[in-house]
């Protein structure tokens, strides 16, 4: 089952944890299982995650569609991800934010995260979606997300996805700073990138519709 779940809580710190789980290692959700409200000021640091199924880090799925809840000021730093194995494409992503149930997810920081050669899945999955199995509505947005000093060494990563829902429910203001894949820093001005390529192509990221202001810098 899941590891460290946060439902409708504020001012939470996980420091120095090791999670090996047969589902999500750590999650942040809004209203869920009798707990009501959004989430603010959640930090996980100096920790190690191993997901035999589903996500190492997962944010945003559950909430109260009538309340338009917010999950904000979430920080993940100095983390080792040892494994990720998920056959279902909808539930892949080492670093995953999937906004559902009219949730807004904003001000998220992933920093100094080392990802090993996991078995099956995606590096990043940012989506606003309507998953009818678990949600009653799509999310409202994902915005202001920083990925800083993220490294991945391996050859099992499938195509990552960054996709909004419509012009009112967008993924926006996403910054990758010193994203390093197999020793190569992915940046908008990187050497060897054909002029007609998107920078995201160099990382094997699919950037779909309703995504705004995504940058890759050294």
Task: Give the location of each predicted region.
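Extracellular/periplasmic carbohydrate-active domains that bind, remodel
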Residues: 1-218
